Regions:
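Acidic helix N-cap motif at the loop->helix transition within catalytic regions
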Residues: 15-19, 40-48, 95
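Short, well-formed alpha-helical segments that are part of the catalytic scaffolds
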Residues: 11-27
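Cell-envelope/extracellular polymer assembly enzymes that use nucleotide-activated donors
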Residues: 3-5, 30
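Conserved donor nucleotide-binding strand/loop of the catalytic core
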Residues: 32, 43-78
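Acceptor/aglycone-binding surface of glycosyltransferases and processive sugar-polymer synthases
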Residues: 60-74, 82, 94-171
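A conserved acidic beta->alpha catalytic loop
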Residues: 35-44, 90
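Short beta-strand-to-loop acidic/aromatic patch adjacent to the donor-nucleotide binding site
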Residues: 80-91
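Conserved sequence signature across two-component system core domains
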Residues: 10-11, 34-36, 58
Length: 171
């Protein structure tokens, strides 16, 4: 039986973190927030949220990769089999969480990548170019066409991460 949580890595997202958590709670009550050394009011906001969220904090910013690995380790320690990651800046819609869960039913060992609206009016020009180039390069190397390879909105099968040799924690 799948046991699913949502991991929210955050760094200085005081203006959006509460809303993101409230939106996620509508679809999943198992939430792990990793506070990656925020220097704004993020930590205080997380402490003020009455819901039973798991919060992992550390004092220095280590990078999103480190925050994700920390969240995955916490999720595994709590007995979760799968984790959905969602960015804390509000660019992903929590109401897509059921789509990830439905996709998991069809591919229980899978890896699912969500897709943002990458139109130029929704994203700075340099980000649009970088994402298009990344998508092109991914397609060239794998033959697989993914519209948003850089999306932080993903579902991971936690057992598949065992032994993964990550070469950097900052991205």
């Amino acid at each position: 039986m799948e046991k699913i949580c949502v991991i929210i890595p955050t760094y200085n997202n005081a203006t959006t973190i509460r809303r993101v958590i409230e939106d996620v709670e509508k679809y999943c009550s198992s939430i792990i927030v990793v506070n990656d050394g925020s220097t704004d009011d993020t930590a205080a906001i997380l402490q003020s949220i009455p819901s039973p969220i798991e919060v992992v904090s550390y004092p220095d910013n280590r990078g999103k990769g480190y925050a994700l690995v920390t969240g995955f380790k916490k999720a595994k320690a709590l007995g979760y089999t799968h984790a959905i990651t969602i960015d804390a800046d509000g660019q992903h819609f929590a109401d897509d969480i059921p789509c990830f869960i439905e996709g998991l039913k069809h591919n229980p060992e899978g890896f699912i990548v969500g897709c943002r609206n990458l139109t130029e009016e929704n994203m700075p020009r340099q980000n649009t170019f970088a994402n298009r180039f990344s998508n092109f390069w991914f397609r060239l190397q794998t033959g697989i066409n993914l519209p948003d390879t850089q999306s932080g909105y993903r579902l991971y099968t936690l057992s598949s991460l065992k032994g993964l040799n990550l070469i950097t924690s900052r991205y």
